[in-house]
UniProtKB/Swiss-Prot annotation:
Disulfide bonds: none annotated. This is Large ribosomal subunit protein uL1. HAMAP family: Ribosomal_uL1_B. Part of the 50S ribosomal subunit. GO terms for cellular component: large ribosomal subunit. The lineage of its organism: Bacteria, Bacillati, Actinomycetota, Actinomycetes, Micrococcales. SUPFAM superfamilies: Ribosomal protein L1. InterPro entries: Ribosom_uL1_bac-type, Ribosomal_uL1, Ribosomal_uL1-like, Ribosomal_uL1/biogenesis, Ribosomal_uL1_3-a/b-sand, Ribosomal_uL1_CS. GO terms for molecular function: rRNA binding; structural constituent of ribosome; tRNA binding. PROSITE patterns: RIBOSOMAL_L1.
Length: 227
């Protein structure tokens, strides 16, 4: 069993494990108990009431956070010609065609978001073993397979996040850094939850969001009261 650090144990004592905290109180607690020396990510975990075994109940989507995530994002784009230049002009870290495909096939994955033009997806699709497990495979449903790669790059750099249920019906996403104000984190959360609610499967019945937790990177979690 992993031994928790003294700082972690100290942080946990300020959180009542059997209590559900209002959103702003929970945000404040996470900020107060973020003991890490780095500016930690502010993480949200949701437990949904869907049946993850049914493909028509999977929840997936993208959302633009009004205050961004606070994270420096590295974006690579599979594109050639004018599209490649548009991606570079928009701030992509790296752009390429078959040459970039070959590099990724050899193990290059030092990036956070991958975007592709439709024309190159025949090649990019062969990178499933490399990109798939890391959640980096471009997908038209999340706007990362598009002819307008310039806009996609700007969105990725400007606070765009993806969400997707795992096999246990959980969704994990980041709404900023612990250095963000309570107001900024609250607004980012509200926008994200609105989009997740819009993605509710039509055939789902019963309570949709069953539990919600906040935490910082390596910090203790706080259970949040649902409205």
């Amino acid at each position: 069993m992993t031994k928790r650090s003294k700082a972690y144990r100290s942080a946990v004592t300020s959180i009542a494990s059997d209590k559900l905290y209002p959103v702003e109180d929970a945000i404040g607690l996470v900020k107060e108990t973020a003991y890490a020396k780095i500016d930690s990510a502010f993480e949200v975990a949701l437990k949904l009431g869907i049946d993850p075994r049914k493909t028509d109940q999977l929840v997936r989507g993208v959302v633009m956070l009004p205050h961004g995530t606070g994270k420096a994002v590295r974006v690579v784009v599979f594109a050639t010609g004018p599209s490649a230049q548009a991606a570079l002009d928009s701030g992509a870290s790296e752009v390429g065609g078959s040459d970039l495909v070959a590099r990724v096939a050899d193990g290059y994955v030092d990036f956070d978001v991958a975007i592709s033009t439709p024309e190159l997806m025949a090649q990019v699709g062969q990178l499933g073993r490399v990109l798939g497990p890391r959640g980096l495979m471009p997908n038209p449903k999340t706007g990362t397979v598009t002819a307008d790669v310039g806009k996609a790059v700007k969105d990725a750099l400007g606070g765009r996040i993806e969400f997707k249920t795992d096999k246990h019906a959980n969704i994990h996403f980041v709404i900023g850094k612990t250095s963000f104000s309570v107001e900024s984190l609250s607004e980012n959360l509200s926008v994200a939850l609105d989009e997740i609610n819009r993605a509710r499967p039509q055939k789902h019945k019963g309570r949709y969001i069953k539990k919600m937790f906040f935490s910082s990177t390596f910090g203790p979690s706080v259970r949040v009261a649902l409205a």
